[in-house]
Amino acid sequence: MKVVAFERQEQGTGASRRLRNAGKTTGIVYGGEAAPQKIELDHNALWHALKKEAFHSSILDLEVAGQSQQVLLRDVQYHPFKQLVLHVDFQRVDAKKKLHTKAPLHFLNAEISPAVKLSSAIVSHVATEIEIECLPADLPEFLEVDLSKIEAGQSLHAKDITLPKGVVLVAHVDAENPVVASATVPAGAVSDAAEGETPAA
């Protein structure tokens, strides 16, 4: 995904306000061997790009002053109540160095799972993303979580996710193995089932 930005000359609160009034958003590019670079971006284009999941989880081609560099979106600052992006941070990517980032989770096949079909359970998505490590070339846009075999009362954990080649969970996630999805039967469904099993007097 390509992002076009411009070098930012002015600095300070007043300059940032003038840029916002002109429909621009301030940003910074850091990391790698180059010095941090202050940039400005078109606010409307950035606002729409931020609605796309891939913008948050993919390697981006950032073009500044005709020079292209590969970056990851690292931080976004929003206005507390206006539909306004105040600032964005991008980190340069080194093709030979592993990234520590978060990958979105896409949950599949809950509707055909035993939990839903046999027990009318509700499958809850406990996590929406998970921390991974990989080289930039191996970075997945998202990770699929197959729920087709989950049963009522069961949970799926981080280590149950099938990871693409070259992708691993970060050390603390691997050690903690947190729950990413769980299947629970609503209290009403349990009591209804119990009543149905009560023998007739």
UniProtKB/Swiss-Prot annotation:
Extract the coiled-coil ranges from the record.
Answer: none
Q: Which UniProt keywords apply?
A: Ribonucleoprotein, Ribosomal protein, RNA-binding, rRNA-binding
Q: Name one GO molecular function term.
A: structural constituent of ribosome
InterPro entries per UniProt = Rbsml_bL25/Gln-tRNA_synth_N (IPR020056), Ribosomal_bL25/Gln-tRNA_synth (IPR011035), Ribosomal_bL25_b-dom (IPR020057), Ribosomal_bL25_C (IPR037121), Ribosomal_bL25_long (IPR001021), Ribosomal_bL25_short (IPR020055), Ribosomal_L25_dom (IPR029751), Ribosomal_uL5_bac-type (IPR020930)
Taxonomic superkingdom: Bacteria
* Gene Ontology CC: cytosolic large ribosomal subunit
What quaternary structure, including any partners, is listed in this protein's UniProt entry?
Part of the 50S ribosomal subunit; part of the 5S rRNA/L5/L18/L25 subcomplex. Contacts the 5S rRNA. Binds to the 5S rRNA independently of L5 and L18.
* Similarity-based family: Belongs to the bacterial ribosomal protein bL25 family. CTC subfamily.
| Reported function | This is one of the proteins that binds to the 5S RNA in the ribosome where it forms part of the central protuberance.
**What's the protein here called?**
Large ribosomal subunit protein bL25
Per the UniProt record, the source organism is Burkholderia lata (strain ATCC 17760 / DSM 23089 / LMG 22485 / NCIMB 9086 / R18194 / 383)
The beginning of the lineage is: Bacteria, Pseudomonadati, Pseudomonadota, Betaproteobacteria, Burkholderiales
As recorded in Swiss-Prot or TrEMBL, the protein's gene is named rplY
